[in-house]
Every structure is written in C-alpha cells, then in structure tokens.
A protein has these predicted regions:
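Juxtamembrane intracellular "pre-TM" segments in multi-pass secondary transporters
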Residues: 1, 179-215, 240-242
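Helix-loop boundary and gating motifs at the non-cytosolic
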Residues: 1-48, 209-251, 323
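Hydrophobic core of transmembrane alpha-helices in multi-pass small-molecule transporters
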Residues: 12, 82, 92-110, 218-219, ...
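Central cavity-lining transmembrane alpha-helices of secondary-active solute carriers
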Residues: 42-60, 253-269
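Cytoplasmic membrane-interface "Motif A"-like loop-to-helix N-cap segments
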Residues: 63-76, 274-286
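C-terminal ends and interior cores of transmembrane alpha-helices
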Residues: 77-91, 288-301
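Symmetry-related core transmembrane helices of the 12-TM Major Facilitator Superfamily/SLC fold
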Residues: 161-178
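C-terminal transmembrane helical hairpin of 12-TM major facilitator-type secondary transporters
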Residues: 280-326
Length: 359
C-alpha cells in the first residue's frame, strides 16, 4: 500500500471516531438519558477544557520523549477504552468524568495525526502543501460516513454510537503503530510548553485589530459548539409537529450536508482569496454564520425543509472561510518569531475557550 493510501486510511479513521458521536451524542443524552441542557453542555465543554492544555502536553511528549506515531496510538487506545466504558454509563457525574478524560486523549490526536502525516510525506519526498490537503479531505469523508452509519442504523439515540466510535478508535490506535517512525526532535528543536500553547503570542492582544480578531474567534468557536451540541436534539423536538418527516427520522443525514458542504467549499478558497483577499473572505464568513443560524431558526422538517438544507450548505462557507482565512490572517500579522505560537493561540480561542463557552 502506498504511503498516501496509508495516510488516507489514518485520516479517515481519525475523524470517523469523532463523527460517530459528536453530532448525535447530545440527542442521546437528552432523549434517552434525560440529561438537562446544562448537563449536556458541560459534557461537550470538556473538549474545550482539554484543548486548552492537552495538545501542548502531548506535543511536548512526542517532541522530546517518544515517537509521535506511538503517542498517537496510545492516545487512541486509551480513548477507545473510555468510549466503550461510556457506552454503559447512564448517570451524569460518571459520564462527565469519562468524557473529560476521553477529550483529554482525543483532542491531542488531531495535531499528532498531522505531525505523523507531515513526517511520512517528507520521508517519501512528497510536497506537503500539495499532497496533504487531498489526504485531509478524507478525514471529513470519514466524519460524514460515521454520521450516516449511525443514522441509517438508527443509533442516534442509542449507546451503540459509542461502541462504533470505541471500536474504530481501537483499530486506529493499533494501526498508528504501523506508521512511519517520527522520533523525538533534538532538544534545540523542541518547543517549550509556553510556545506550544501560544502563551508567548499574547503580546498580539496589544494590537486592537488582533484583539478583536481573537475575541471574535472565540465567539465563532462557541457558535460552532452550539451547532454540534444541540443540532440533533433541536430537530428531534419537531417529532410531534412533523412525525415521519426526513429531518426528524434522519437528523444525522440532514446535518451531514454541513460536512459535505465543508468539503466542497474548501476547494473554492484559493479562488476567493485571490479574488477578494483575506479580510473580505472573513467578512463573507461572518455574514454566512448569520444566515446559517437564521435559516436554521426559521426552518422546520416540514414545509421549511429547504431552509434547513440551505442552512447546512451555508455552513460550509461559514466554517471554511473563517478557519482558513483566519489562520492565514494570523500568519500574515504575527511576527515570524511567534507565528507558531500565534497559531496555537488561535486554536485556544476557537477550540478551547470558544468550545468551552459554547458548551
């Protein structure tokens, strides 16, 4: 099997694990376990808490002590055990603790899988800029595939979604150990904890422009978390008004249009950036988020289904345009000495604080 095919399989499984439960777990907890909205939100906020420090810690471990592919495999195997354990838990306090630890081991794997991919491509003499994006797209395809499987098998309100996620995490954990070796870096090349989590980039808050950008990033991170958290249960609330409709019977299939749109819109970004520039593309994203939630609010699974579908399609623009143009904006505005840290700060504001407040 070629290295690209192996990396595609890894990327597919990486997000298949997440897609198995991220969109549907909220509905399972509210409808089946009878958790309150606050309890569900707090469980989802564990991803934000974990994102504040665990990627940096695991990054340091892989930079200084152990091979990155081994750390990746270890994290997924531990995560698999936690997910399988969570499938048999029905009380809030225990499930919260388990999902907190699961987040602590899953969230770092997103960056670790990128590190393993970059290393494998470099070792095989391939251009990362050209080769990695088509590989990463398979991650989104894996996410969509997991959502469809959970929906078609009618597991959206069942703990079986956690079995699926746990089983695929175990498979990925074992598979990770077969990836090309990425040994620890030399001590002079290893990042410090402060550098890894972006603490030395806080100087950017002195700039009004950057301060506004980072605060807005946090709000968008919160909006994304709300979408992931309550989208399925929001559609489920229509079951008495529109029984038997597509949106009620297959919420994951409907919501997966968002990820399909995301996959397609990412291909248009080079054109929009060249035509309009970073700032205008970011403005398009802000406007798209307004329409995303506006259409979602006034739509319904009955006569308003087209509005829900449009909301899902617009999500692709809202998510991709801000994430990618935002990252490029940080790269352009930050001093070269702290660019890596600035990107870390961008991730903290969106996936860390944003996800926490959104939960």
């Amino acid at each position: 099997m070629s290295i690209k095919a192996r990396l595609i399989a890894m990327s597919f499984l990486q997000f298949f694990v997440w897609g198995s439960w991220l969109i549907s777990l909220g509905g399972y907890m509210i409808v089946t376990l009878n958790f309150t909205g606050v309890e569900v939100g707090s469980i989802f906020s564990t991803m934000g808490i974990a994102s504040l420090f665990m990627p940096a810690i695991m990054g340091i471990i892989s930079d200084r002590f152990y091979n990155a592919e081994k750390v990746l495999g270890f994290c997924h195997i531990v995560g698999a055990a936690l997910l399988l354990l969570a499938s048999n838990v029905t009380d809030y306090p225990t499930l919260y603790i388990i999902m907190l630890f699961n987040s602590m081991f899953y969230m770092p794997t997103i960056a670790l899988s990128n590190t393993v991919s970059y290393n494998a491509l470099e070792k095989n003499g391939l251009d990362i800029v050209k080769s990695f994006p088509p590989i990463r797209v398979w991650g989104t395809i894996g996410f969509i595939a997991a959502m469809w499987i959970v929906d078609i098998l009618d597991w959206t309100k069942s703990p079986y979604q956690l079995y699926l996620s746990g089983g695929s995490a175990l498979l990925l954990g074992l598979y990770s150990f077969t990836m090309p070796k990425r040994p620890p870096l030399k001590s002079s090349d290893a990042k410090s904890f402060a550098n890894s989590v972006g603490l030395d980039a806080f100087v950017l808050f002195k700039s009004k422009k950057m301060a506004i950008f980072f605060v807005f990033s946090m709000f968008l991170g919160a909006a994304l978390q709300i979408t992931n958290l309550f989208g399925g249960s929001f559609l489920d609330d229509f079951k008495t008004l529109y029984p038997g409709t597509f949106g009620v019977e297959h919420p994951n299939l409907l919501l997966s249009i968002s990820q399909i749109s995301e996959t397609l819109f990412i291909l248009t970004i080079p054109f929009f950036l060249q035509k309009f520039g970073i700032k205008k593309v970011m403005l398009f994203s802000i406007i798209a988020w307004v329409f995303r939630f506006g259409l979602f609010a006034i739509g319904n699974p009955g006569g308003g289904l087209i509005l829900l579908i449009l909301s899902m399609i617009i999500y692709g623009m809202a998510f991709d345009f801000f994430n990618i143009s935002g990252s490029l904006f940080v790269e352009r505005e930050a001093d070269p000495k702290i660019r890596a840290s600035a990107q870390g700060l961008f991730m903290i504001m969106t996936n860390g604080l944003g996800a926490f407040f959104g939960g």
